[in-house]
Amino acid sequence: MNQEKDQELVQHLAKQGVDVKMVMGHPASLFVLFFTEMWERFSYYGMRALLTVFLITEISKQGWGWSNQDAMELYAWYTGLVYLTPLIGGMIADKLTGYRKAILLGALIMTLGHASMALEGTSQSFFYVGLVLMILGNGLFKPNISSMVGQLYPDTSAKKDAGYTIFYMGINSGAFLGMLLCGYIGE
């Protein structure tokens, strides 16, 4: 019975044009998505852990010396827009680009956002451009990578729930490690 279900999964993957290699009874592509999302969440939560610390740190200590209120206001806007833009990013993928292209474009835009923020020392505008790029990239990336997990399995597959569990373990691992390590390094 299990071999029949595995064969059904392999046939589904082949029909989707996805590599049919299996790892621990799941499509190997699941683990690519696992690590991709893990590092994206590491990046997001790591940067969030450092954002307000950087903004309120005194200028003499390489920060911007903002008040707590101003730093939290920017943080609130950033976080709110990060959660709003996936609605638009999902529609863009559905109507224009497809999931894969949206994920790749989102990842590229977020990478440019991190690079821009790294140049903050040359001009403060790089910091703001970086935040905007991070928001826009997240909007394209976040809703679509989860959709790709669902496409790996037939609707009737009993392994679909387990696949999402594995995927969400990557999300939670990245978030935990990002806050822990980046917060520690930032201090």
What do the predicted segments below correspond to?
Residues 1-45:
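Cytosolic juxtamembrane N-terminal segment immediately preceding the first transmembrane helix
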